[in-house]
């Protein structure tokens, strides 16, 4: 998993509420176990016509937003069914962080476990970010995970919360299994020092 400490990127706003996982990635992709290429299916019904041609009026198809790594999304993002593929599709497209006023809990957990940073902001900040994008699509935003803050173009900082363990994993680029593997020597030392507490089959 790629570490996330601090990065600066342009943003893209999709100010729609209740974007569910089926809209993020259609169910037909759920049989896929390889993450490669899932970015092409991101928001498929919104991005493409029936013949596969891109819809020019959809925001992600605009030439001036290509390469954006930060998505600004409406409230209750990632609701609906539990599908890890939704996170994989967002990452496959190139997003490293999604900012919203609220994330569905299962999506939020899937994002953190896979290295996609979900950032919760208040309503005022959300509208401010959407306005920045509307005024200038080339606006850049810095995500400073180490200090848990967003840095706007003119230097304004906005703090955001994150679970301490999730932050540790993201900053160090390790998933939960990787964290446990790194702690194996300490676990073995504890078990050796406290044999009566170790239950064996």
Regions found by a protein language model. Name each.
Residues 1-74, 78-79, 85-105, 109-201:
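Cytosolic catalytic domains that perform sulfur/thiol-centered chemistry
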């Amino acid at each position: 998993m790629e570490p996330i400490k601090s990065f600066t990127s342009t943003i893209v706003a999709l100010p729609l509420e209740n974007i569910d996982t089926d809209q993020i990635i259609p169910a037909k992709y759920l049989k896929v176990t390889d993450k490669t290429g899932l970015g092409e299916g991101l928001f498929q019904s919104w991005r493409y016509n029936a013949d596969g041609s891109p819809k020019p009026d959809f925001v992600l198809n605009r030439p001036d937003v290509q390469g954006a790594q930060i998505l600004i999304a409406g409230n209750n993002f990632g609701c609906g069914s539990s599908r890890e593929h939704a996170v994989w599709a967002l990452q496959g497209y190139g997003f490293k962080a999604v900012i919203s006023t609220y994330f569905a809990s299962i999506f939020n957990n899937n994002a953190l476990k896979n290295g996609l940073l979900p950032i919760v902001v208040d309503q005022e900040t959300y509208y401010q970010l959407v306005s920045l994008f509307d005024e200038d699509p080339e606006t850049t935003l810095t995500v400073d995970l180490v200090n848990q803050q967003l840095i706007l173009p003119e230097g304004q900082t906005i703090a955001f919360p994150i679970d301490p363990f999730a932050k540790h994993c993201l900053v160090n680029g390790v998933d939960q299994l990787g964290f446990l593997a790194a702690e194996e020597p300490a676990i073995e030392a504890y078990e050796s020092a406290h044999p009566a507490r170790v239950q064996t089959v």
